[in-house]
Amino acid sequence: MGWREKFDVLREKVKADEKFWGYCDLHNPASVTFIQAVQEKYPFVSEEYLDFLRNTDGCTLNIWFFMGSGAPHFIPEWVFDPSGCRCPALFGEAQALSESLPKWRNVAELGLYLPIGRDGCAETYFLMLEDGQILEIDCETKKTSWDRIIANSFGELLDNVIIGEKYYTLGCDDPGDWSPYNENDWTRFLNEQGWWVH
C-alpha cells in the first residue's frame, strides 16, 4: 500500500475519530496555480511531490508539517490554539531558510533544494535535493554533522518513514532503541494497520 492509499485510510480514520485530527490533518488539494508556481520556481521537483500537492495542500502527520500554499484550512472548534495548527507556507519557509542557512552552513554544497517539511518546532527540516533525495537537517544544533539522507525520494519518505516501517528512524538510530515512552495514538495506529510493526 502506497502513501495515496494510506491517505485514504487516514481520512476515514479522522472521519470516524475526530480527535485523531490532532495527529493527521489532510487538506483539500492545492490550487493548480500554486502547483504551477512550484514547478516554475523549482523545476527539479519530483512529480510525486506535485501529486502530493494535488492530493492535499500541505498536511500534518503526527509531529511533522508538510508544506503547502499556506492557504486557510479547516481546524476543529475544539482546538485550543488554532494558530499552531496551520501548515507552513512553502514559499515563506523557502525564503526564511535561504536567509538563515547561509549563516551556519555552506549552501553551495547543498545545491538546489526545496524545503518540503519540518517538525512542529522548526528544528528539523526535510529538504528535497535536486536528485530527488530527501535530506534531514538540524536547524537547532546548526551542525552539518547531523545531516542525513532519510529517503531516496519523496514517496519513500511518506511510504516508508512517516507512515511506514522505518518510522523509528525519526527518533532512534536503531529499532531496539524504541521504548513505550515514544508511543502515542499515531504509532499505535501505524501498528494496527500493519504499516509499522514493532
Indicate where each model-derived feature is located.
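Compact, glycine/acidic-enriched structural inserts
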Residues: I137-Y168
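Structured loops at beta-to-helix junctions and adjacent beta-edge loops in soluble globular domains
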Residues: G117-D119, E130, I137-E140
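Intrinsic-disorder-associated interaction segments
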Residues: W3, F7, S83, C87-L90, ...
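A surface-exposed partner-binding patch
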Residues: M1-C121, D173, L190-H198
